Amino acid sequence: MKKKTILSCISCAVLMLLTACSNDDITPTEKSKVDATKAIEFKVDFADYNSEQQVDMTRTGGKGEEAVQQTIDLGNGIVAQCTLQRDTTRKSKAAPTRLLENDTYTMLAYDPVTHALKGEVTGTVTWGVFTPTSSNPSIILAPGTYEFVLYNSKFTRSGNNLTVTRANAGEAYLGRTTYTVTAAPIKQSVAFTMKHVGASVKVKLTGYMDFTGVTGTLSSVNSTAVPGSSTYDASTGTWTTGTGAAMTANTTFNGSWETRYYSETYTAITNDGTAFMPSTDVSKLKLTFTGGNIYKINMAGASLTFNPTSTLKLDANGAYVLNVKLMYHFLYLMSDGSRGFIEETTYGGGTKTPIAVVVSQSKHLAVALEDANNGNPCVWSTLDPHYVQYNKSAKDDAKDLLTLCNGYSETWDASASIDNTTVKGTSTNFPAFKAAGDYTPTLPSGVHLTGKMVGKKWHLPSIGEFMVAYSALGFAKLSDATTYSGNLNGLYLDWYSSLADVAFTQVGARMWSSGFSPGKYYHSSSELTDSSFPHRAVLQTYSPKNHAYRLWFAYHSNWDGYVRAFINYDE
């Protein structure tokens, strides 16, 4: 009996040992698995556009490279200089984050080696944390490394493929992260950085005159040029660009905020960015103006296609600004007597040398690029500075001088002088006239005046010719002076001085209207006899960088002033 009892005890012990060994083989694996949705806190952050880029840089084919400027003739008297640049504007994250949290999100877990889907769950994002809300809110994972993918409702899912259309590209967000799940009974944390799937493009206009009512469209150049969708393989993390599709997006520009006349440049930018799929080729985009004005030119119908020399494709989560600088197409008088635009000059890739800016084609009138007399001031006359009238065309009313365009006659015709003898353009008694008459453009080595420019004479401009120039170069309004009820002496007249400066600086000359302090006084050929003695008309280009020019009627003819020669060219 005792022997049987001992054997029975031994049998029970062996059975218990075998059972324990069996539990060691199976149960620990099940016990070590983790419900990812409970053991792990999934933190969610929404990244700004360009979060991974140096946002102070522009780019062409690669990240951080400078964009190459492209010049496009719009065919309406305006030239556009285009560059593409990363949008450096930072937006407030609070409001967008609240909006993005009001959405449904899906999280997928993948084996990074086999790319097998290990689980999925849907939920919401609240206060930066993903919370499952689906009927099966669990993802059971064994300890190990996994790739987690989180995306919002703007995707269409088919198995592992997540497809987003261009229409949803601006609101589609995707995050991917790798994390090693442990069996330790501690709260674990995984961070998602959600980024825009698409790219955003704004258009910024810059000009030397304020914009009014500008509208337009940003569209594809054809029906297949711009990707209509992209598909993300969540198992491998790779993108596939979909087929091309036609697109057109309306663009409305905010008005120029700068004060009229007082700013050096004026800007208008689209209120919202236009969304595109990543890898969109910028050369396939076309900007067409449907309304608005600048430089007194209606922009409707003008269009441009940005076509850089190297391929430039948009990045996911990239925000860009297509900068379009609208330049007035100034006309130049060349050293051979022909007229042409900047692209025909050596400063714009052409072969011709500019010597003057054309201010009136109907009057065949142009203004020199530089001051006469080597840039030094001189007096109007060395003779009696007070009581002698020298011009037959002197006027009693200053307003009559505003339309008088007889500078050539006053400079070169003896019959224009009171004595019927003096040719002021050759007389040392009239230094301002002689300086204008002696003016010769500074030309590059080997370049000479040819054709109809040989023997052509320059002259001291009249007040009326100055008015023509200020109206043509800086859109001054002559009516501001002709309708003025007070004394014109010392009157400030508004114009876009920085625009006028560009006419000179873009062809290598100095600024005419600005950059000097307190201002430059320019002699005219005109005289005013509104009292018992004559006055000489002088204009002041007020500065620094001011909005106005100023009319003066000098008491003395021996006041110092600068000379800017004008010329009447031949057709």
Regions found by a protein language model. Name each.
Residues 2-8, 18-332, 352-354, 385-414:
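Sec-type signal peptide cleavage vicinity
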Residues 353, 359-459, 463-476:
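Short aromatic-cysteine micro-motif
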Residues 464-571:
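C-terminal, surface-exposed recognition/capping segments
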Residues 149-151, 202-204, 366-368, 457-459, ...:
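Residues within well-ordered beta-strands of beta-sheet-rich folds
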Residues 313-375:
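GGW-centered surface loops in extracellular recognition modules
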Residues 272-275, 433, 437, 441-447, ...:
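A motif-centric signal for short, conserved binding hotspots located
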Residues 141, 195-196, 358-361, 450-454, ...:
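Extracellular/periplasmic catalytic domains that process cell-envelope and extracellular macromolecules
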Residues 93-99, 448-452, 553-556:
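Short consensus segments that form the blades of beta-propeller domains
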